[in-house]
């Protein structure tokens, strides 16, 4: 009876076998990319000589220089200096409060998901492999069974898609492979018992610690899109291992019609470094630099051997010379015995030519070439040439030389925005119960904000002329900025603030002129500065009106009998008004001035 029920399920053994055949077709189309990923990992670890090892000289020294590694490490440091932060903007005025709450809650959700570590791992893979992949999932077991959003860095080597698609969302099927312990899987899924033979193999990185897969099984996470009865594409999920279906969303009555996620997208965000046509994966800096790095390493290898040979005294020795070779090779002996007479024909030193200057110049030119093609010139690391010593000049050169880094960051920020959209969609679907998040207020204090999916779900539209307009789902825009800025960016921002202060931008009397100047300026946070200047300008107008009223009151008091003293007191109060009002506007010492 159980077999009959299993056959009646939408996803059974036949569907699993067909999915595995599709996986094999996808693997064949991705074989060249997998080989490149494995080779690039060796290049990054400076172990690429394994690909060029001479079988006749297995123990011969093969030096590797770290120019390529240094370039990638510097670019990763640039990425970590510009850690992203989201700001959510509403598209409708009714969603303003929800957008503000999301702007405060999203960074907390990312922090709880350990996103900074994920961001770092994705950037390493983006620079090494050419593509960084981030997975946005719903983990129902998190928070003690309450469930929460999980963010993972995904290994591109374990992902397979339809060959020829440019956007990963256009692939009809998507497979993610992983290795898990067979005994643990069997304990969790009893239907796996007796199916220990693997039916799928996975590519491997080359490791030095001798990893084994004896007790492992390949788990296939099969994501696929299929239309429902209304023609809308639904995302479904199936977990396979050794040809056995462990779980399928189409077999789950709660998800059979709805799909795994309501947003209907694959939970993977691809961020290619350099785009390739007809592929969601790109190529990285290792693919661009490894030929130049290989030439540098070969020259270093030849030069090292030349220096070693030149530093040792070697001899050309005839068989008839009669020299005791053991004594000659022993540098600790002062006397070397000889039988017969020596001459230049039977015994002479072997001279090794030293390094030529043009050889060193050529190697240095290849090093400069590698720096140039990777955009990792000395200026980007703080070095200077040509006598540049002024701090402002060095900063300007560094900013001008960081165009490639800014371009990479823009690509990463676009991918980060797509990740945030997926997170918001998961909140919309799964945040049924209200949760409390600790956020940092505008003045730096801790605040506790309740949040649920109520503000994210569809709201009924008011009827017009007795006609129901249905419901409207809130839609948001995401603007990404750098939460952790580089030292230069912070110094530049501080200098801008000091210049605005010195020029009197915050003086209420200069509000109109300051606003005219700020309209022509563009820097981060300029809208907040404009708002403060407008506030100061409004305050100045109120002060002028109040001073006029006080002057008229003083004149009226002076005309009254005995009103001279009262008029003087009023005049003194009028003189104090600008100081008190300015103090209130600037909010000195973080306290309200009364």
Q: Which ranges hold each PLM region?
A:
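Extended, helix-rich architectural segments
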Residues: 1-257, 320, 354-358, 362-365, ...
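Short coil/turn segments at secondary-structure boundaries
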Residues: 84-89, 117-125, 136-140, 306-319, ...
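Conserved structured core elements
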Residues: 96, 100, 117, 283-286, ...
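Generic, well-ordered alpha-helical scaffold segments in large soluble proteins
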Residues: 105-112, 292-310, 331-338, 353, ...
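Extended amphipathic alpha-helical segments with heptad-repeat/coiled-coil character used for oligomerization
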Residues: 140, 392-511
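Extended, charged amphipathic alpha-helical segments
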Residues: 221-387
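Long, highly charged low-complexity segments enriched in Glu/Asp and Lys/Arg with interspersed Ser/Thr
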Residues: 512-552
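Helical coiled-coil/dimerization "stalks"
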Residues: 555-594
């Amino acid at each position: 009876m159980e077999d009959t029920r299993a056959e009646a399920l939408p996803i059974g053994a036949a569907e699993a076998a067909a999915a595995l055949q599709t996986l094999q077709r996808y693997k064949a189309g991705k074989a060249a990319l997998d080989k490149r990923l494995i080779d690039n990992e060796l290049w990054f670890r400076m172990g690429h000589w394994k690909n060029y090892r001479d079988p006749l000289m297995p123990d011969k020294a093969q030096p590797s220089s770290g120019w390529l590694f240094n370039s990638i490490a510097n670019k990763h440091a640039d990425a970590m200096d510009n850690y992203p932060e989201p700001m959510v903007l509403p598209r409708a005025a009714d969603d303003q409060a929800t957008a503000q709450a999301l702007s405060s809650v999203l960074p907390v959700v990312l922090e709880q998901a350990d996103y900074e570590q994920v961001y770092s791992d994705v950037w390493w893979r983006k620079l090494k492999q050419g593509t960084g992949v981030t997975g946005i999932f719903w983990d129902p077991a998190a928070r003690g069974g309450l469930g929460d959003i999980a963010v993972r860095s995904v290994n591109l080597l374990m992902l397979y898609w339809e060959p020829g698609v440019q956007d990963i969302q256009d692939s009809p099927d998507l497979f993610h492979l992983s290795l898990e312990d067979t005994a643990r899987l069997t304990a969790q899924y009893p239907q796996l018992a007796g199916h220990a033979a693997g039916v799928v193999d996975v590519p491997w990185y080359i490791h030095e610690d001798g990893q084994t897969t004896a007790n492992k099984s390949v788990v296939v996470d099969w994501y696929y899109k299929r239309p429902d009865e209304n023609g809308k594409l639904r995302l479904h999920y199936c977990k396979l291992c050794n040809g056995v279906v462990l779980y399928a969303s189409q077999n789950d009555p709660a998800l059979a019609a709805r799909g795994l996620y309501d947003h209907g997208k694959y939970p993977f965000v691809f961020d290619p470094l350099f785009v390739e046509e007809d592929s969601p994966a790109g190529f990285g800096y290792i693919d661009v630099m490894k030929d130049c790095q290989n030439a540098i390493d070969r020259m270093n290898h030849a030069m090292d051997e030349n220096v070693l040979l030149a530093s040792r005294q070697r001899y050309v020795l005839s068989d008839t010379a009669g020299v005791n070779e053991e004594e000659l090779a022993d540098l600790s002996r002062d006397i070397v015995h000889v039988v017969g007479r020596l001459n230049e024909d039977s015994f002479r030193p072997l001279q090794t030519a030293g390094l030529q200057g043009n050889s060193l110049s050529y190697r240095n030119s290849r090093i400069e070439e590698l720096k140039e093609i990777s955009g990792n010139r000395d200026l980007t690391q703080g070095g200077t040439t040509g006598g540049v010593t002024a701090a402002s000049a060095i900063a300007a050169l560094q900013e001008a030389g960081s165009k490639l880094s800014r371009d990479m960051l823009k690509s990463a920020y676009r991918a980060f925005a797509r990740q945030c959209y997926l997170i918001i969609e998961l909140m919309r679907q799964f945040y049924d119960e209200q949760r409390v998040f600790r956020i940092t207020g505008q003045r730096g204090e801790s605040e506790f904000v309740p949040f649920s999916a109520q503000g994210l779900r569809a709201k009924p539209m008011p009827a017009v002329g007795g006609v129901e307009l249905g419901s409207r789902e809130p839609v948001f825009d995401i603007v990404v900025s750098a939460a952790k800025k580089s030292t230069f960016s912070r110094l530049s921002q501080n200098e801008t603030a000091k210049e605005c202060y010195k020029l009197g931008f915050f003086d209420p009397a200069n509000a109109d002129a300051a606003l005219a100047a700020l309209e022509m300026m563009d820097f981060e946070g300029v809208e907040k500065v404009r708002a403060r200047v407008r506030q100061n300008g409004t305050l100045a107008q109120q002060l002028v009106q109040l001073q006029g009223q006080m002057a008229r009151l003083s004149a009226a008091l002076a005309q009254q009998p005995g009103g001279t003293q009262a008029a003087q007191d009023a005049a003194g109060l009028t003189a104090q008004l600008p100081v008190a009002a300015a103090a209130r506007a600037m909010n000195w010492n973080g306290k309200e001035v009364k």
